Amino acid sequence: MQTITTSYAGPTNTRGSRILVKSWLKNKAFGWDYSLNSEANHKVAAQQLVDVLNADRIKQGYADFQWSIVAAGSMPDGKGNAYIIDLIEAK
């Protein structure tokens, strides 16, 4: 079981708004989708990281179990979300 956290990073002079996604296994930033609301942007970014982690597992020969989001909630400070991921047997 792992935790993924997401947080919003506003635009700078060189980069647009994005969601920062952090986990023990990997950290990434994903661009903000202006067609989605804030909650959906965080959820999509977390799922994108899960997809990256699963691709890494397949490359390493561990395709029998895949990461999947099993629970989600907002952070206590209100500055992002937390997602619990666990390895689930691949179908």
Residue ranges and their predicted role:
Residues 1-91:
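Catalytic phosphate/metal-binding cores of nucleic-acid and nucleotide-processing enzymes, i.e., regions
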